[in-house]
Amino acid sequence: MYGIEYTTVLTFLISIILLNYILKSLTRIMDFIIYRFLFIIVILSPFLRAQNYGINLPITGSMDTAYANSTQEETFLTSTLCLYYPTEAATEINDNSWKDTLSQLFLTKGWPTGSVYFKEYTNIASFSVDPQLYCDYNVVLMKYDATLQLDMSELADLILNEWLCNPMDITLYYYQQTDEANKWISMGSSCTIKVCPLNTQTLGIGCLTTDATTFEEVATAEKLVITDVVDGVNHKLDVTTATCTIRNCKKLGPRENVAVIQVGGSDILDITADPTTAPQTERMMRINWKKWWQVFYTVVDYVDQIIQVMSKRSRSLNSAAFYYRV
């Protein structure tokens, strides 16, 4: 009898010990699985994009309702506007207080006194050599001149777009343009650009690489030149480096905080023919030639419409920054 009781107790104890061992083993296995799973989740979470589900709040009202931007009407309170005009405008107006008058008129359109800056430039040529567009919004007035039509078009292409540029060493290297957005931009007091296309043996095509007089002249004594050649073909260049600097540039896209207003002229400047130029007619405008007072009155009257087709940008443009990143 006692032997049976001892056997029963011993069997019970062994069962308890075995159960405890099994439970501990299961606990260790579950801990391993859980911690390994959490570890994998932590490692992969930076590389995954998942929806973060929160409290399910009911949405009342129509989702199609148009809500006005609360800052849209306050644009002028925190922004600056630069108005660039030629010297002849100030000469014709001949009034020492004309800027104050215009500032008061801009105030009636929502631009506080001190937020509008009047920037004078001597002529298109000098402005193209050293463009300085520092304001949130920049409006450039260019009076049409048939003799400067090319410079005006290239200046518009320069300031209405952003460019990434690098220096060129034309004495050591041949250069080629990789695509239509790749241009060579030259600036200086007098830029004469000659090019000689090369074949795969680096021999001149229709020119002699050792004789610059046989090169094809693409620009003569200009202040600003945007040179476009056949893509994928090496070229040897001859540039008047004493009075001109040339850069290898890539057009990145539109500079949306700049607008150009052509004043007068029977021909309308249009740079949208370039396949790399997105339609920019909204930021390149024209008004009929009148007295300069009337021109400025027109700009003030339509400043709201002009600004609406522009976008505020923080990146400025000057001739130094232009060469590297605009």
UniProtKB/Swiss-Prot annotation:
Ca(2+) 2 binds at Q177, D228, V229, D231, D301. It is found in: Virion; Host endoplasmic reticulum lumen. N-glycosylated. Glycans are attached at N69. It comes from the Viruses. Residues 237-239 are annotated as: LVD motif. The keyword Signal applies. Its main location: virion. Residues 165-167 are annotated as: CNP motif. GO terms for molecular function: metal ion binding. One of its GO terms (cellular component) is host cell endoplasmic reticulum lumen. Ca(2+) 1 binds at D95, G206, T214, E216. Keywords: Calcium, Capsid protein, Disulfide bond, Glycoprotein, Host endoplasmic reticulum, Host-virus interaction, Metal-binding, Outer capsid protein, Signal, T=13 icosahedral capsid protein, Virion. Residues 253-255 are annotated as: GPR motif. Gene3D superfamilies: Glycoprotein VP7, domain 1, Rotavirus outer-layer protein VP7, domain 2. The keyword Glycoprotein applies. Disulfide bonds join C82-C135, C165-C249, C191-C244, C196-C207. Residues 1-50 form the signal peptide. One of its GO terms (biological process) is receptor-mediated virion attachment to host cell. Some rotavirus strains are neuraminidase-sensitive and require sialic acid to attach to the cell surface. Some rotavirus strains are integrin-dependent. Some rotavirus strains depend on ganglioside for their entry into the host cell. Hsp70 also seems to be involved in the entry of some strains. Belongs to the rotavirus VP7 family. Homotrimer; disulfide-linked. 2 Ca(2+) ions bound at each subunit interface in the trimer hold the trimer together. Interacts with the intermediate capsid protein VP6. Interacts with the outer capsid protein VP5*. Interacts with host integrin heterodimer ITGAX/ITGB2. Interacts with host integrin heterodimer ITGA4/ITGB1. Interacts with host integrin heterodimer ITGA2/ITGB1. Calcium-binding protein that interacts with rotavirus cell receptors once the initial attachment by VP4 has been achieved. Rotavirus attachment and entry into the host cell probably involves multiple sequential contacts between the outer capsid proteins VP4 and VP7, and the cell receptors. Following entry into the host cell, low intracellular or intravesicular Ca(2+) concentration probably causes the calcium-stabilized VP7 trimers to dissociate from the virion. This step is probably necessary for the membrane-disrupting entry step and the release of VP4, which is locked onto the virion by VP7. This is Outer capsid glycoprotein VP7. It comes from Rotavirus A (isolate RVA/Monkey/South Africa/SA11-H96/1958/G3P5B[2]).
